[in-house]
């Protein structure tokens, strides 16, 4: 089922349980409880930047900058940023910049 449809069905009371990404803004929006996956049925989701090799050769500084984010953003932080952008309609650039400044990765 399309992710947005899942949350619409939850909101309407049509369903009570869904599978979701732990970084979904809607988990916070609908005050949902996330069950622990103690059987590890769902693999961890970790976003990763992908570039064409040519681009990285032309902009080698990007690789170093992005590597500073490796294993830095928690699911809770990503969920909060997604919530600010998706639900509160905050500017994605500003939300990302605030995070980077808070973590000492941008000035």
Question: Where on the chain are the PLM-derived regions?
Answer:
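Alpha-to-beta junction loops
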Residues: 11-20
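Ligand-binding "clamshell"
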Residues: 14-15, 26-40
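Short secondary-structure boundary segments
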Residues: 21-23, 53
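A short pocket-lining beta-strand/turn micro-motif at the edge of beta-sheets
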Residues: 15-16, 45-47, 62
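Short helix-initiation/N-cap motifs at beta->coil->alpha
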Residues: 1-8
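A bilobed periplasmic-binding-protein/Venus flytrap-type ligand-binding module shared by bacterial periplasmic
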Residues: 46-59
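Ligand-binding clefts/hinges and TM-proximal coupling segments of bilobed small-molecule sensing domains
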Residues: 61-107
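Active-site lining segments that contact anionic ligands and/or coordinate catalytic metals
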Residues: 20, 29, 44-46
């Amino acid at each position: 089922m399309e992710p947005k449809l899942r949350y619409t069905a939850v909101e309407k009371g049509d369903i009570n349980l869904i599978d979701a990404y732990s970084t979904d803004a809607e988990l916070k929006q609908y005050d949902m409880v996330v069950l622990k996956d103690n059987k590890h049925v769902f693999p961890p989701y970790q976003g990763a930047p992908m570039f064409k090799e040519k681009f990285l050769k032309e902009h080698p500084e990007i690789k170093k900058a992005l590597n500073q984010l490796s294993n830095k953003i928690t699911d809770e932080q990503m969920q909060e940023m997604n919530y600010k952008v998706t639900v509160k309609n905050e500017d994605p650039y500003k939300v990302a910049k605030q995070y980077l400044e808070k973590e000492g990765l941008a000035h």
